[in-house]
Design a protein with these regions (language model features):
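Catalytic PLP-binding core of fold-type I/II PLP enzymes
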Residues: 1-15
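Short hydrophobic/aromatic beta-strand micro-patches
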Residues: 51, 131-133, 171-173
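Helix N-cap motif at beta-to-alpha junctions
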Residues: 54, 136-137, 175-177
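Conserved glycine-rich beta-strand-loop-beta hairpin in the small C-terminal domain of fold type I
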Residues: 83, 99-109, 120-133, 164
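PLP-dependent enzyme catalytic core of the Aspartate aminotransferase-like
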Residues: 145-154, 160-194
Length: 194
């Protein structure tokens, strides 16, 4: 199962390759799950797109999914919105959003690399999330510290596996002013700790 919900937000020079396009072997054994929700900010309109190339795998999916009534989990507004953005008429809007997010990403990465040397930032090629290793900060629980001391809410890396307790995930899909304010508060809280 390949979750490709962030696949629409890809920065220049990079390319998203859906799992079903990787190889014949991948097509034969993969389920691609995606949505327009992240790229087009349609989180309030529930929907999902499930692509299964292999007929026997698709049949197994239908049998497994049938009792859950997934086909009726959406609504007419969701269907209309998804149909509209998939026709290409919102591509220019998505390009503008992607450009804005890239500038936010660059600003956040630059700030953290320059001002918070104990954080190691993985620079994303797409999406609007930073994955940050905080092991250089000497904090027992980085996400808790940032919430309590900096008043900045981040995702605790431990939610993604026990090995990631020293990591945080930061959403940078917000106004540049709010992002700058959050980054400054992180730096200030860490400066006061030192």
């Amino acid at each position: 199962i390949s979750d490709e919900v962030h696949g629409l937000i890809i920065y220049p020079g990079k390319k998203h390759i859906p799992i079903l396009c990787v190889s014949a072997a991948a097509r034969a054994q993969s389920v691609q799950v995606t949505s327009m929700s992240k790229g087009f900010n349609l989180m309030a309109l529930p929907h999902a797109i499930i692509a299964i190339a292999d007929p026997s795998l698709r049949e197994a999916w239908h049998k497994a999914a049938d009792p859950f009534d997934f086909y009726y989990a959406s609504n007419p507004f969701s269907v209309a919105a998804v149909t509209k953005v998939m026709d290409g008429s919102a591509d220019q809007w998505l390009a503008g959003v992607t450009d804005y997010l890239q500038k936010n990403r660059n600003m956040a990465v630059s700030f953290l690399q320059r001002e918070v040397p104990g954080m190691t930032v993985t620079v994303p090629e797409g999406s609007f999330l930073l994955w940050i290793d905080c092991s250089g900060l000497n904090l027992a629980h980085p996400a808790e510290f940032l919430l309590e001391k900096a008043r900045v809410s981040v995702n605790d890396g431990a939610a993604f596996g026990n090995a990631y307790g020293q990591f945080i995930r930061v959403n940078f899909a917000l106004t540049r002013q709010k992002l700058q304010e959050a980054l400054e508060r992180i730096r200030q809280a860490l400066d006061e700790k030192a």
